[in-house]
Amino acid sequence: MELELRYSAEDISRIIEQALVYQCACPAQIATTLLELRDLFDYQVKCGDTDDTNRRVHEAIARATAEAHTRMERCLDEVLDIEGWDRNTLTMPEALRARPTKSL
């Protein structure tokens, strides 16, 4: 089982960096969630249980994680489009760079 990635780890790091520098939490929260889902997926896939029940448990978690990851990548696409990010450079638009600070 493989996880399909629309965004590389470097892309996600760039989004988080932009969001932290310019204090815009929403894209960073989604990006951080994607990294956490990737870690969870990797753990479930690599868990080498040979016991049938445990194997099935890990497969179920991996499948659900892959589905959540796909949905969150689509959500990130939508958020970046709505906010007007430059999709080639993953640069936040100027208008968002001056927003007041909210909790990251």
What positions do the PLM features span?
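Amphipathic alpha-helices that form helix-helix packing interfaces
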Residues: 30-33, 37-40, 44-47, 57-75, ...
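Short, charge/polar-rich alpha-helical segments
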Residues: 19-31
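Amphipathic alpha-helical binding modules
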Residues: 62-104
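A conserved regulatory-domain signal marking ACT and ACT-like small-molecule sensing domains
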Residues: 2-3
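Short, charged/polar, low-complexity loop and linker segments
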Residues: 6-21, 46-56
